[in-house]
A protein has these predicted regions:
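Cys/His-enriched microdomains
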Residues: 94-97, 134, 161-174, 190-203
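Conserved alpha/beta core surface patches that mediate binding of polyanionic ligands
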Residues: 2-11, 33, 134, 144-156, ...
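Short, flexible, solvent-exposed loop/turn segments with mixed acidic/basic and small polar residues
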Residues: 14-19, 50-56, 182
Length: 223
């Protein structure tokens, strides 16, 4: 019987379990998004080749445990039919995580999924001295905890007051959580040292009196 190359299997997402010749398969999931087709195939494989359940990881991943050694090649073929691929383990670029971003969330400032797909396309699985993680979050609510990733990307809005559209209603001042906005003598004053570029002022304004451009806040090193 040929010797099993456990290192190569782990590199390709198949992690050894404590049960002999059983593996938990980590799948490649980009930005936490799975289609109905993906989900159906994952359920089918988990039922046929696993023990009928999956594990949702802390980084938006999916793992199918109790895959038998002799079924590994067949499992990969079956998953491919549903648009699913094995993930990676070890010292390489891991799953790119993302919140739902501005395509769904009212607070989102950037298209997080589009960015996650691009990062995944460029870097996923790349060999490095240590495991490496990207995280993309859409706004200052920071649902994805961007700073905990080796590279964190947080959506922001660069805002500029447009005096000719302003009706001095004060909504922007009330919306600002960092007290960066003050209205003085009919003018909106922005203290950019206090501004966290959340964009709440622009989104709350009833007359579109803010020029708002998407931007990115980057963090490096993780926690």
């Amino acid at each position: 019987m040929a010797e099993v190359d456990y290192a190569t299997l782990k590199k390709g997402g198949f992690m050894r379990q404590k049960q002999k010749d059983n593996f938990s398969l980590r799948l490649q999931v980009v930005g936490g998004a799975l289609t109905v087709e993906n989900l159906k195939k994952i359920a089918e494989v988990a039922e046929k080749y696993g023990d009928g359940h999956v594990h949702l990881t802390s980084r938006q991943g999916v793992e199918i445990p109790f895959i038998k050694l002799q079924d590994i090649d067949e499992v990969k073929e079956e998953l491919a039919k549903g648009g699913c691929k094995p993930g990676v383990c070890g010292p390489r670029v891991r799953t790119v995580t993302a919140c739902q971003g501005n395509q769904i969330c009212p607070s989102g400032n950037i298209d997080t999924y589009e960015l996650a797909v691009e990062l995944d396309k460029r870097y996923f699985g790349r060999e490095l001295p240590h495991k490496f993680k990207f995280g993309v979050t859409g706004c200052q609510n920071n649902c994805l905890k961007a700073e905990e990733n080796d590279v964190g990307i947080k959506g922001a809005l660069n805002v500029k007051w447009l005096e000719d559209k302003c009706i001095n209603c004060g909504v922007c001042e009330k919306a600002c959580r960092t007290e960066a906005i003050k209205i003085e003598d009919g003018k909106v004053i922005v203290d950019y040292d206090k501004c966290n570029y959340c964009g709440r002022c622009a989104k709350a304004c009833p007359t579109d009196a803010w020029d708002a451009k998407a931007a990115y806040i980057l963090s490096f090193g993780g926690t």
